[in-house]
């Protein structure tokens, strides 16, 4: 899985170790 702070995209929550992709309105987010 992707570690904390890794780049992720909309709908990618399941690939983050935390299970959450945090968005701040950009084209990509970071795994939180």
UniProtKB/Swiss-Prot annotation:
Summary of the tissues where the protein is detected: Expressed by the venom duct.
Record PTM Serine amide, positions in chain: 32
Keyword Secreted included in the entry's annotation: yes
GO molecular function, one term: toxin activity
Cellular component, GO, one term: extracellular region
Role, per record: Elicits hyperactivity when injected intracranially into mice and produces paralysis when injected into the pedal muscle of freshwater snails, Pomacea paludosa, but it has no apparent effect after intramuscular injection into the limpet Patella opea or the freshwater fish Lebistes reticulatus.
Protein name: Conotoxin sr7a
Organism for this UniProt entry: Conus spurius
